[in-house]
A protein has these predicted regions:
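Non-catalytic terminal/accessory segments
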Residues: 1-175
Length: 175
């Protein structure tokens, strides 16, 4: 039709999946590719809320980048692989099966993790808003959800090391 259109290149979302180490490609006996989701070992030591918010942030980030594209709905495939990689990450963390993790954390058919705030118990749900094409740009697209900013634990090992104070003798460390 002579118009310039924005599309989501297949190589980009597959490249992101490979970059995040969420799946591996195996060849069957006929030489056909088989995609197998895998857990993300680097996230196993993170808290439950950090794991789900990491996956949500990565999915939302790619969606918001390509939300004006004509074929943005192909990111549903991206989200599906990310979802099962997240399930496998939780299953590996708790040394159980994917089915048991889905059954344990599903609430009204949506995978959800609880977290505590000053106002009480809240739920962080896995992204399930779909990938509909947006015709107008949202100005608040870069605003993170509240749990993404507030849930950095000040008593985490990294924060304790950054303080530069020995916890045994209270002396300042050099590094």
């Amino acid at each position: 039709s002579g118009r310039v259109m924005l599309y989501v290149p297949k190589e980009k979302w597959i490249g992101k999946l490979l970059e995040y180490h969420t799946f591996k490609i195996k060849l069957d006996e006929n030489g056909k590719e088989k995609w197998k989701t895998i857990h993300r070992g680097k996230l196993i030591n993170c808290s439950d809320i950090e794991i789900i918010s990491k996956f949500n942030t990565e999915i939302r980030g790619l969606y918001h980048y390509y939300q004006l594209a004509h074929n943005v709905s192909v990111l549903g495939k991206f989200a599906h692989i990310m979802e099962y990689s997240m399930y496998k990450t939780y299953a590996c963390k708790y040394r159980t099966t994917v089915r048991k993790m889905v059954d344990k954390y599903s609430r009204n058919g949506v995978f959800s993790i609880t977290y505590q705030t000053k106002k009480g118990l809240k739920w962080c749900e896995f992204y399930h808003d779909g990938f509909k094409r947006v015709r107008e740009v949202r100005l608040d697209a870069d605003t993170l959800p509240e749990y993404g900013r507030k849930y950095n634990n000040p008593n985490s090992n990294a924060a304790r090391i950054k303080r530069g104070v020995c916890e045994l003798c209270s002396q300042q460390t050099k590094d």
